[in-house]
Regions:
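N-terminal cap/lid segment of alpha/beta-hydrolase-fold proteins
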Residues: 1-26
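The alpha/beta-hydrolase serine catalytic core
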Residues: 5, 13-16, 103, 112, ...
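The serine-hydrolase catalytic nucleophile loop
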Residues: 37-50, 65
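Catalytic nucleophile-loop/oxyanion-hole region of alpha/beta-hydrolase
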Residues: 41-42, 68-99
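Conserved alpha/beta-hydrolase
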Residues: 50-72
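Alpha/beta-hydrolase fold nucleophile elbow
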Residues: 96-108
Length: 149
């Protein structure tokens, strides 16, 4: 396995920090991993899951959402929709520089974000969530933000 630091522009124009875990040989597939609320790409579980997937030939890019970890931008100006948009920008980066992802993985609020983004990322064949709301609308319902972005 090898690991590369990468950067790409996010939905609000900030530079987002990412790490691409690659298998030793040509990847069979690419995946995007979305971390939990206020976590980051280097969270232990995200790192272990990403590296384990490389053993099965899956390259995984995990990144810090706008304003978190090594990414630029102001976290105070972000919201659920901007996280979903950051995922779409991550997809565009992977498609332009490597290969389109076919798998989305999300933990907690990142899981809700991948569920919301899946229809905007054209080649997705599978979505995996870990401890996530079953639908993005659950986040809004619980917070009282139903009907808002």
């Amino acid at each position: 396995m090898r690991s590369e630091k990468v950067e790409f522009s996010g939905s609000q124009g900030a530079v987002l920090a990412a790490r691409l875990e690659l298998p030793e040989y040509e990847p069979r597939a690419y995946a995007l991993f979305a971390h939990c609320f206020t976590c980051g790409k280097d969270q232990v579980a995200a790192t272990r899951i990403s590296r384990a997937l490389t053993e099965f030939g899956i390259a995984v890019m995990r990144f810090d959402f706008t304003g978190l970890g090594g990414s630029g931008g102001d976290f105070g100006n972000t919201h659920f929709s901007s996280n979903v948009d950051d995922l779409v920008f991550a997809d565009e980066y992977l498609r332009a520089h490597f290969e389109a992802p076919t798998l989305l993985i999300g933990h907690s609020l990142g899981g809700a974000a991948v569920l919301a983004a899946r229809h905007r990322i054209p080649r997705i064949r599978a979505v995996a969530t870990i401890a996530a709301p079953s639908a993005p609308t659950m986040c809004c319902t619980c917070s009282g933000a139903t009907g808002r972005r």
